[in-house]
Amino acid sequence: MSFRKVVRQSKFRHVFGQPVKNDQCYEDIRVSRVTWDSTFCAVNPKFLAVIVEASGGGAFMVLPLNKTGRIDKAYPTVCGHTGPVLDIDWCPHNDEVIASGSEDCTVMVWQIPENGLTSPLTEPVVVLEGHTKRVGIITWHPTARNVLLSAGCDNVVLIWNVGTAEELYRLDSLHPDLIYNVSWNHNGSLFCTACKDKSVRIIDPRRGTLVAEREKAHEGARPMRAIFLADGKVFTAGFSRMSERQLALWDPENFEEPMALQELDSSNGALLPFYDPDTSVVYVCGKGDSSIRYFEITDEPPYIHFLNTFTSKEPQRGMGSMPKRGLEVSKCEIARFYKLHERKCEPIVMTVPRKSDLFQDDLYPDTAGPDAALEAEDWVSGQDADPILISLREAYVPSKQRDLKVSRRNVLSDSKPAGYSRSGVSTATAITDIPSGNLAGSGEAGKLEEVMHGLRALRVLVKEQGERISRLEEHLGRMENGDT
């Protein structure tokens, strides 16, 4: 009997990570050294925020995404806290609003100017006071406007209406020990927590009740994290009794045994999982690691499918993840991370290689947009709503090569096209839009014909190479599946 090796088919098998060039990094940022298992970084389509070292209090830096290169030491910061900042989170419904939690026991919400900071920001829009110990966790409600959750080292979870500075719910009896992280579910009707007592809990915040609990989800003593997936399952990252790092997938309807359990390695850095509900891919970053592992979650055993690992030389001190609406879809970018080094932030782009330069519908289903589905009052009254979805097709920008291929302009015409301007010719259409008399400044038709002949030959060559690559990929697929 012969056994054939079956390779699981997945459009994400060949996802690869690539750091940007040095001039696209953010240099000379003094990343916070505070001892706390937070990401220290938050990013949205407009701004990058990084918790930084600050004397006499806590601060974080907010940079427009295009503010790359070396950051001046005098660059203004958000510096209203009197103790170190532990966590920050951008509002999903307003790209200029960010919340922060600090060792000074307060939560502050800030309005960032549209074009970024020109002077230090010391006055928050609102200060939320209710915790008696440091606040280490901040997370906005995914669909209800102005609803913010905070969790502190007093083992208390508070839910606020930021618009009125009102404390909506206080959950102070569900956690006997330090809360490691909090994650809302898809529509914000529930959230899950990972706690120092090794339990994962699913909580209904409006009822103040425990919906489900799994004790000793991971038996190790080091910090673990739990996140909700789009289908209601829970993904956890923690440590075994022998201090090996583990990943697990749970069904809250049956919390007795994990659906899947994978051991990674014996490193001691806390694992930070980032989940993309559109692709069902989980990216796992370890604090102090120099790698990002990524896994696809499916309904088929073994449920957690390893895809690949991005590896670099420098360890990461924190990590931020760009929302899907901030990605470059024309480059088949499915994720972008902002890796914190000791003194810089380095974007890392995750790309699915595709030959076609058309919009890739299968990679970019409709995704959560910036509009809130509910007001805070609606959510408090018991309403739930899924995120309002938007299409990323409008963000698609055809590549220069595609512009060239679809051009139908008569390049041999001596007349200038309507609206022609020498200074306004774009790179994408420069070859086809410039009249023949201006091509080399000489008016020689022979040179123009030579250029056009070269273009036609190049197109034929590209087509032949594409067909050859397709045949090789098909042959390789048959070999992997044992058909040859």
UniProtKB/Swiss-Prot annotation:
Keyword tRNA processing: no
Any single Pfam family the record assigns to this protein: DUF1899
Coiled-coil regions, chain positions: 447-481
Family the entry assigns: Belongs to the WD repeat coronin family.
Single GO MF annotation: identical protein binding
GO terms for cellular component: actin filament; cell leading edge; cell periphery; cytoplasm; cytosol; glutamatergic synapse; lamellipodium; perinuclear region of cytoplasm
Residue stretches of each WD repeat: 80-120, 130-170, 174-213, 217-260, 265-305
Protein name per the record: Coronin-1B
Main location: cytoplasm
Function according to Swiss-Prot or TrEMBL: Regulates leading edge dynamics and cell motility in fibroblasts. May be involved in cytokinesis and signal transduction.
Any one GO biological process: intracellular signal transduction
Signal peptide, first to last residue: none
Residues recorded as bearing Phosphoserine in the entry: 2
SUPFAM superfamilies: WD40 repeat-like
Gene3D superfamilies: YVTN repeat-like/Quinoprotein amine dehydrogenase
Domain of life: Eukaryota
Keyword hit for Ligase: no
Post-translational modification: Phosphorylation on Ser-2 regulates the interaction with the Arp2/3 complex and cell motility in fibroblasts. Phosphorylation does not seem to affect subcellular location.
UniProt keyword list: Actin-binding, Coiled coil, Cytoplasm, Cytoskeleton, Phosphoprotein, Repeat, WD repeat
